[in-house]
């Protein structure tokens, strides 16, 4: 292998002696070269000010202008500078993470402001606020904001997703429910017996008093958990009914799950709302969870992010599910065990495709969750001991991740190189070349709009041997050094620096802007190769395209489709 240090020295020498710069290039060639644009080019260049020079995607531009100014008097504007202090001084806070250009955020704005006004008499209990996620990107990343608007409701600093309707009435109603007493009192054995016979799941706290600090913590925890009822009692006979020692130190708490082998789970952590809510969220689910559209939110929003998934066809489930369930008992509170019916077209097929699983063979897979989304496959026989060993190695970070990939293309001679998971190292991470990589999704409208422009960029730069222009289908391929942040994501990998994080392109998606970006960050200087002028003149004479073209049409703004 070529020495990396020698390569860096060589690159540094090239940089010191290079006299060319981006400003030396004749960029008019990139702007005004109408000769290579077909008359029917859907991405055709337009004159500035042309009535057609707008973005066709009204998802982002519709409704930008408001008929009337919005009174946001009661909406607090938060930033990284005041966010933590504001949450510390307000027990209940609803926060909208928005982007100024987002049409859905603009549509929400009047309802959100009206909801804040309606709730203003309860200012001592709740506040509505907003954060510009395009400015405070660290805050958005901290709270895993992946689309706009994202609305979170914080209780004692603990966030909970708001997934209700984006109307004033829905927001006000939802918040009022969160502010209402979330815990019910049990004072008699008869009341307790009704709970035991009538509810599949319940939380019971045994307290010295049904009011005070401990009761407040239980009430706050109940507001963080929608799917289970919370109860409190000071009656020792009720405690006995739930197998709690009435003489034991209070407060104490137990989770009832009638449908499970282990029907009672006792809590021994700090008596704080967030800790209690985490305990409930981690323990309310069964040992093995069947993935359906209804159960998906509770599975993937669970505080336990790491999962072991069993993919098996329906008629084989009776053989493998008991094995899977037995293995799961050793990892309660550490891992979620999830059963996926492989031949279920509604859920099984798309989930299997997401993880790159083909065929109908029974498969056990470990998944790290949405933060880094690494997958690991169990090799060998599916047995209790093998699954347990696999899960233990997963927790101890001893496994090698799997990354899905399409087959390497047999021919790859185009101006834009086709990258898949298996050949990214050879094409993009080649230390001797600068590389620009677009990660796209076939269904993404912004990717489709970018394609003609990106192809033109590849065509203009095809004669530069030190530079690679490439693209990869991010829905069918994965690589640890190419992680998309929405689609399209455009990443630049400078030569000699492939061990560093790639540089993300955030500018307008035009040939000129992408060219300037490459020129700025390229390790190996290059000069734009303009085609022969006589050939250009001949092509222009044959073209019906306008000769007075000023700018290439593109989305113009760095919009992305969500993952």
From Swiss-Prot:
Active-site residue list: 102 (nucleophile), 105 (nucleophile), 444 (nucleophile), 447 (nucleophile)
GO cellular component, one term: endoplasmic reticulum lumen
Leader peptide range in chain numbering: 1-22
UniProt site (Lowers pKa of C-terminal Cys of second active site): 509
Ranges of biased composition (kind: Polar residues): 543-563
Keywords carried by this UniProt record: Disulfide bond, Endoplasmic reticulum, Glycoprotein, Isomerase, Redox-active center, Repeat, Signal
Basic and acidic residues: bias regions: 529-542
Motif residue range(s): Prevents secretion from ER: 560-563
Root EC class: isomerase
Glycosylation (residues): 82, 185, 315
Site, as annotated: Contributes to redox potential value: 445-446
Function per UniProt: Acts as a protein-folding catalyst that interacts with nascent polypeptides to catalyze the formation, isomerization, and reduction or oxidation of disulfide bonds. May play a role in storage protein biogenesis.
Family: Belongs to the protein disulfide isomerase family.
Name listed for the protein in its UniProt record: Protein disulfide isomerase-like 1-4
């Amino acid at each position: 292998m070529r020495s990396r240090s020698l390569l860096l020295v060589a690159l540094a020498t090239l940089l010191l002696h290079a006299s060319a710069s981006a400003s030396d290039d004749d960029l008019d060639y990139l702007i005004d070269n109408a000769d290579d644009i077909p008359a029917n080019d859907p991405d055709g260049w337009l004159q500035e000010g042309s009535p057609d020079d707008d973005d066709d995607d009204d998802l982002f531009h519709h409704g930008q202008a408001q008929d009337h100014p919005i009174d946001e008097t009661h909406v607090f504007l938060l930033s990284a500078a005041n966010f933590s202090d504001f949450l510390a001084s307000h027990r209940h806070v609803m926060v909208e993470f928005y982007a100024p250009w987002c049409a859905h955020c603009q549509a929400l704005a009047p309802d959100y402001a009206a909801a804040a006004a309606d709730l203003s008499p309860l200012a001592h209990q709740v506040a509505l606020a907003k954060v510009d996620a395009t400015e405070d990107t660290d805050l958005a990343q901290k709270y895993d904001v992946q689309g706009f608007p994202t609305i979170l409701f914080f209780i004692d600093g603990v966030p909970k997703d708001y997934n209700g309707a984006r109307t004033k009435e829905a927001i006000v109603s939802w918040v009022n429910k969160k502010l209402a007493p979330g815990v019910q009192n049990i004072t008699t054995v008869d009341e307790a017996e009704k709970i035991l016979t009538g509810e599949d799941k319940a939380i019971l706290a045994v307290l010295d008093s049904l009011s005070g600090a401990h009761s407040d913590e239980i009430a706050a925890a109940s507001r963080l958990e929608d799917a289970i009822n919370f109860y409190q009692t000071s009656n020792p006979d009720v405690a006995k009914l739930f197998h709690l020692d009435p003489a034991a130190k209070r407060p104490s708490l137990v989770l009832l799950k009638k449908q499970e082998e282990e029907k009672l789970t006792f809590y021994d952590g700090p008596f704080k709302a967030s800790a209690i809510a985490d305990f409930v969220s981690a323990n309310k689910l069964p040992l093995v969870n069947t993935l359906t559209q209804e159960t998906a939110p509770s599975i993937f929003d669970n505080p336990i992010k790491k999962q072991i998934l069993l993919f098996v066809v329906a008629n084989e489930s009776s053989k493998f599910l008991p094995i899977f369930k037995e293995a799961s008992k050793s990892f309660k509170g550490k891992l979620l065990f999830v059963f996926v019916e492989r031949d279920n077209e509604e859920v099984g097929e798309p989930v299997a495709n997401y993880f790159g699983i083909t065929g109908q063979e029974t498969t056990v897979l470990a998944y790290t969750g949405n933060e880094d989304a690494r997958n690991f496959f169990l090799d060998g026989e599916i047995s209790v001991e093998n699954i347990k060993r696999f899960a233990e190695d997963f927790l101890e970070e001893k496994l090698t991740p799997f990354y899905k990939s399409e087959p390497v293309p047999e021919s790859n001679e185009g101006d834009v190189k086709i990258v898949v998971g298996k050949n990214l190292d050879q094409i993009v991470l080649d230390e001797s070349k600068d590389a620009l990589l677009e990660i796209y999704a076939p269904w993404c409208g912004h990717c489709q709009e970018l394609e003609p422009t990106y192809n033109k960029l590849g065509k203009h730069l095809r004669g530069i041997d030190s530079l690679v222009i490439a693209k990869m289908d991010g829905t069918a391929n994965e690589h640890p050094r190419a992680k998309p942040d929405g689609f399209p994501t455009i990443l630049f990998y400078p030569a000699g620096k492939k061990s560093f994080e790639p540089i993300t392109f955030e500018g307008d998606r035009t040939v000129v802007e992408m060219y300037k970006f490459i020129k700025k960050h390229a390790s190996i200087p290059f000069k734009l190769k303009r085609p022969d002028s006589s050939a250009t003149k001949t092509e222009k004479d044959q073209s019906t395209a306008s000769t007075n073209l000023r700018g290439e049409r593109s989305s113009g703004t760095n919009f992305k489709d969500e993952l």
